[in-house]
């Protein structure tokens, strides 16, 4: 049953308003929808485009690997993703934050990377791309003055349910902030000491639910998504990868590690095979650099 059916709406009826009584009457079904979408965010995005109507074809369609990425990132508290350029990893990571903000009211999330201006540009570009492809996301953002902000080195996206995510600097200036989860973008370039002593401790406090309670076991709380291309052994990012890999074996419900090569973007048409071949045929071709960038 589609949500519009629960609300008794269809194309032939004009929507006048949603009363408190109508919402109270369908609360059990709404809880089931939200619980389901938290596990299947790709289907939530499909729903935003079709309203649950099987006769409507969504304009934005996921590739199979993108659906896997979204589901893993939403279901596990600790996720480490090592993918090559052109894999849509930043696009999907920001989409995860937007889905979490919508489906977890009053949550506070972050994005950080080696440079604050770099993270601001990445987030702003991906949010605009997502909102253009799926306008329903844009309608969830609070665009009133003083709410959503977009600047050169700082962005904050506030949602109508009180949730928000922003970019935070990987520096001492971020000490004392409070968030429930976030993304470490291109973690291979982030200072490990700052990440351990400043950024990760911002997630000490769990999300305050709408009923005033906190649930430490909620996957959102202290959730960490590390996204990067391949780096080097003996670094903080490599040690973190090994830590998550061990947890994936010893505590499989807690952590997940994903990886991929240039072949998947080429197979799905996101990247040209001729471009990859030109890189290999270039006179300045460096096999080690190519392996890091394209064979993650």
Model regions and ranges:
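Phosphate/NTP-binding elements of NTP-utilizing enzymes
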Residues: 2-295
